[in-house]
Amino acid sequence: MMRQYELVERVQRYKPDVNEALLNKAYVYAMQKHGSQKRASGDPYFSHPLEVAAILTDMHLDEATIAIALLHDTIEDTTATRQEIDQLFGPEIGKLVEGLTKLKKLDLVSKKAVQAENLRKLLLAISEDVRVLLVKLADRLHNMRTLGVMCEDKRLRIAEETMDIYAPLAGRMGMQDMREELEELAFRYINPDAWRAVTDRLAELLEKNRGLLQKIETDLSEIFEKNGIKASVKSRQKKPWSVFRKMETKGLSFEQLSDIFGFRVMVDTVQDCYRALGLIHTTWSMVPGRFKDYISTPKQNDYRSIHTTIIGPSRQRIELQIRTREMDEIAEFGVAAHSIYKDRGSANNPHKISTETNAYAWLRQTIEQLSEGDNPEEFLEHTKLELFQDQVFCFTPKGRLIALPRGATPIDFAYAVHTDIGDSCVGAKVNGRIMPLMTELKNGDEVDIIRSKAQVPPAAWESLVATGKARAAIRRATRSAVRKQYSGLGMRILERAFERAGKPFSKDILKPGLPRLARKDVEDVLAAVGRGELPSTDVVKAVYPDYQDTRVTTQNNPAKAGEKGWFNIQNAAGMIFKVPEGGEGAAAKVDPAATTPKPGKRALPIRGTNPDLPVRFAPEGAVPGDRIVGILQPGAGITIYPIQSPALTAYDDQPERWIDVRWDIDDQMSERFPARISVSAINSPGSLAKIAQIAAANDANIHNLSMVRTAPDFTEMIIDVEVWDLKHLNRIISQLKESASVSSAKRVNG
């Protein structure tokens, strides 16, 4: 275990004026607080925060960050308090230590929800101070290095979370070495057989090519030296996870991989980068399409380098990366490379890491999505997609560079420029030509967005975008449009309700009733009424507490059934019902054009609907005995579907529109309900008559029949019948199946 003076010396090597007192005090305090605590491995617990601090010294971080690393588990696992740490080390360090503690306190049901909440909390904490990320990643790295002592289930869970969240997040923030080590450690536990196989093959390949790599390294160094370029050349081999991922994604065998080895060339200036590139291309043949200039166009994580691939001495492909030493430091440490902290009299007053980097721009954009209303699991899905995706670089007509994930469309581009441009997008010109909005953008495309003030982003756009920002904005706009429709419906319902009550109505009149309704504003009331969450009579009573509902229904005056205050409801057979607004207990009168039910009985026996909203059956129909559900249709009331209806899949992502409803029937119910049967019958004289006889024998009425397909030996048809309930329908289908004239019969749902 590292001694106190050794830690101070490690920091002094890169920061001679280190605040030794702060480091010594944090070391002693953390060691005393953790005391005799042990890790799962049996090692003293204090060895963990000490190793986390050591990892951060490798990044050349300041003493305040090192102190935070030493203290990061004290509040959670010892008797230490935030107040005590504030007094000893200052409020800034105390705040960050407490923030790291909160990241661990989770009690969620699903693994996915835990990951989502972990990521959400981490990103919000990073937005306040990036040192949270640096300590958290170092903490995760040491835990991964010592993961072998855990049980298998826990190893797998931690490794998967590391691969899904922490490794790509380190990459997004530019910390490539950290990302690679996290990936390799996670790969080892997620797929140990594959890790072992790839590792062994790479070791064999390295041994076989060691001499060749040394020769190329020497050749490159000599070329640069002859031309006056001060350069260092270092060979490198792809990591096992990188090799395995490429094999999996591209369907290649190990033998088919051609760029396992590469070289990194580091020079002093940007000018030397391009001079070195020219020398390389004049010495060896380059592979077309493999040149990338990330110096002129940096990645979103601030990575800068020139990539090229050449045909080497033995005709194999060799990848080269050319960069300055400063670029190499940023590529290795990412945001940590920007953390040049300078003591200004207090360890709690450092220069903050620059927030103007591309990595921070991505972070800010990601955090903005947290306020767009996505649930945590959706946020996790969208952010994980962006963590892993490669990039394309496109331009506005004025030359502004827009970086997008691979697979992005003009809609993503529009939202990347500005949310208002995305919301008003109706078309796009790509390189001067009008292209479909689903077009996948490519590197170098110039995109000009066509706009309209009347545009409302359709929900279908969600399937066309690749960025979380676009998806969140589309979802927000869709919710806003639906809410507007609900508000409009609620307005009409309340106008009628207040008119029935003989009371004046306006939006301003609703304001005094807001406290009684427990609603924040008038629009919230209108939307709640439109959604069916709030009965209109409750609103009237909230505004006029002395109001008494004296509406007349057919229970006490059947003659009123045709007057204002009734809704027309049409079932799938086209029958028109008059349903009162008075609620479930009110009677209903069937339109004279339709079949008349027994006197005093309801025509639509459904419970659970709002009395203020019109109700109708879906076209495929439902019969008593079916499990049913109501779907709120903005501006159209409630539609009743059988639970097995395929049409319900369109509402899977809109749970707020689902209403729990049920049948309300009794033995005296005489209403019939439409159902549809698909029949395949033998094509012979009398077959149709036998089918009609089965329906008649079961007291069912066939009100429509259509031939779907006719062949020499059979006929397929759709029969619409009217039945009392599900048992009645099943009995008819069963007897049809038993008929010698019928080869198959089944109910049609949708």
From Swiss-Prot:
GO cellular component: plasma membrane
Gene3D superfamilies, per the entry: 3.10.20.30, 3.30.70.260, Beta Polymerase, domain 2, Hypothetical protein af1432
Secreted recorded as keyword: no
EC number(s) given by UniProt: 2.7.6.5
SMART domains found in the cross-reference section: HDc, RelA_SpoT
A Pfam family per the record: HD_4
Gene Ontology BP, a term: guanosine tetraphosphate metabolic process
InterPro entries linked: ACT-like_dom_sf (IPR045865), ACT_dom (IPR002912), Beta-grasp_dom_sf (IPR012675), HD/PDEase_dom (IPR003607), HD_domain (IPR006674), NT_sf (IPR043519), RelA/Spo_fam (IPR004811), RelA/SpoT_AH_RIS (IPR045600)
CDD domains xref list: ACT_RelA-SpoT, HDc, NT_Rel-Spo_like, TGS_RSH
Assigned protein family: Belongs to the RelA/SpoT family.
Name the record gives this protein: GTP pyrophosphokinase rsh
Organism: Brucella suis biovar 1 (strain 1330)
Record gene name: rsh
